[in-house]
Amino acid sequence: MNSRTKIIGSMCIIGTTVCYGLIPSLSFLSFDAGVATETLLFNKFFYAAVLMWAYIFIKKIPFRMDAGAAKMMLVISVSYIGVATTLYISFNYISGSLATIVSFTFPAMVIAIEMITGMEPVRIMKIAAVILSLLGLALIVWTPDIKGNITGIFFAFLTAVCYVGYIMGLASKRMKKENSIAVAGYVLLSSAVFNCIRCALSGEPMFAAGKVQIIYMFLLAVICAFTAILLYCIGVRMIGPGNAAIINTFEPVLACIFGYFIIGDVLTRNMITGGIFVVAAVFIANLPSKGIGLKPGA
């Protein structure tokens, strides 16, 4: 890997991390503008899916899968729908910064499952990552100012659980040969269909109305979904999934910074300390690994 390739690849992953870090703040700005959760998710995934599939067809990226891969793709899609749904439910109770921190306990969960099942050997650094993640989560949960928001923390934790299913599905042998952009296209499409049904059942409008709402939907779909995924795929090809995962560790940090400056999120001492523990755990978890696959932002 030459220095130019490394710099460009790293910049792509940094761009992805910034895009993902903006998701909570832009989502809350959308809520303030009067966009319902169901409408937001449908618009975000629908427009991103249109762009992604246009890219797939223009670039002639292979997207057909055999029966085995198609079944695993269904598991991955359902898991990701769970990620987006539970994360946005948590937004009803806690800040986007806090929800992002809690959801980032998923790498420690993956490590724990891999060690318990024998998929990965037991290593001190891996155990340290799990312990740090649990300590960070405990500090966040025990923050005095958020005792009334255990429901939000619970749903953010469910987001992490769904991420585990999603990540392990991506890492399965059946999906190794599939193009990551095609996989992202299916994930976005299935999420759009699911939230279209949610809009129909809830009575919420499928499309945002008004200039401000449309701008926020455009930013979430084009920047936080389509561009973020595309940059991630390009970056991974250039610097490898391991290096990409390490850079992506800083997503919850950026989410907190953006939340604080853009929408005025409150950051308590326990939240900051717990967040540092979680970020450290993710960093340790990814340092010796080969990466955890594609992670389209929720």
Map each language-model feature to its residues.
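Hydrophobic transmembrane alpha-helices of multi-pass small-molecule transport proteins
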Residues: 52, 122-142, 195, 249, ...
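Helix-helix packing/entry segments at the starts of transmembrane helices
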Residues: 11, 42-43, 99-105, 170-192, ...
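Specific transmembrane alpha-helical segments of multi-pass solute transporters/efflux pumps
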Residues: 19, 24, 53-103, 139, ...
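Transmembrane alpha-helices of multi-pass small-molecule transport proteins
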Residues: 32-82, 109-110, 161-169, 184-203, ...
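Juxtamembrane helix-entry segments on the extracytoplasmic side of multipass membrane proteins
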Residues: 5-9, 34-42, 65-70, 142-165, ...
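C-terminal transmembrane-helix exit sites in multi-pass transporters
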Residues: 51-57, 87, 106-131, 253-273
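Hydrophobic/aromatic residues within transmembrane alpha-helices
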Residues: 30, 40, 44, 90, ...
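Glycine-/small-residue-enriched transmembrane alpha-helix faces in small-molecule transporters
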Residues: 1-39, 43, 86, 145-172, ...
